[in-house]
């Protein structure tokens, strides 16, 4: 997350009158702050990590007594569209492969509950949602994710720049078609109180 997004979050919190919220940019690979927070929230991070258990343990350690750890992570195998679309299929294959080559697990969401248990985090609660769109900003999520990861797809030699460009065009035409449907990934939320 960059400083621009953090400034937007700070502004939104100030507009809402929230004075007890802090937004900071930290490297999760070496972040350690035991018993420092009433709530620790982590969204869409663990599937990028080769050692998600390490961060889960450190996040749990950062929660004060009476506080909560809330983690959301996707299971990208759950994405779908209708009717079938080559650009969408390219996005799923390419994005998943980049995550894998960089040491992550694009389906970590379904493993999150087991991760809590293995990390010794007691009594986790589990919820899952899967957004679906026929129009609007949410429907552009697959396209915008493919666009944002285009350089990584080429750098990892998953596909050529020309293949990415062609798939972006195919996926965009599909996205703006009001007769089509695109889902997001299944999103697993697991939480526990200390």
Question: Where do the PLM segments sit?
Answer:
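Conserved catalytic/acceptor-binding region of the Class I
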Residues: 70-137
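Short glycine-dipeptide loop
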Residues: 63-69
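Local beta-strand N-terminus motif with an aromatic residue
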Residues: 37-38
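Class I SAM-dependent methyltransferase SAM/SAH-binding core
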Residues: 1-33, 53-58
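C-terminal helical/coil "lid" or tail adjacent to the Rossmann-like core of SAM-dependent
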Residues: 119, 123-182
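A conserved beta-strand element that flanks and buttresses the S-adenosyl-L-methionine
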Residues: 41
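A short His-aromatic
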Residues: 47-48
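Short hydrophobic/aromatic beta-strand or adjacent loop that forms the aromatic wall/cage
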Residues: 185-191
């Amino acid at each position: 997350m960059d400083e621009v997004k953090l400034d937007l979050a700070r502004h939104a919190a100030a507009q809402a009158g929230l004075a007890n919220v802090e937004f900071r940019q930290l490297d999760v690979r070496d972040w350690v702050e035991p018993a420092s927070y009433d709530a620790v929230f982590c969204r869409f991070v663990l599937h990028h990590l080769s050692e998600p258990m390490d961060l889960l343990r450190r996040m749990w350690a950062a929660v004060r007594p009476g506080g909560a750890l809330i983690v959301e992570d996707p299971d990208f195998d759950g994405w779908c569209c209708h009717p079938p679309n080559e650009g969408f299929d390219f996005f799923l294959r390419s994005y998943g492969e980049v995550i894998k080559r960089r040491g992550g697990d694009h389906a970590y969401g379904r493993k999150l509950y087991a991760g809590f248990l293995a990390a010794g985090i007691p009594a986790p609660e589990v919820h899952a949602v899967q957004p679906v769109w026929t129009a609007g900003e949410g429907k552009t999520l697959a396209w915008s994710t493919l666009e944002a990861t285009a350089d990584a797809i080429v750098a990892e030699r998953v596909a050529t720049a020309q293949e990415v460009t062609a798939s972006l065009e195919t996926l965009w035409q599909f996205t703006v078609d009001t007769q089509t449907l695109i889902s997001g990934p299944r999103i697993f939320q697991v939480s526990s109180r200390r």
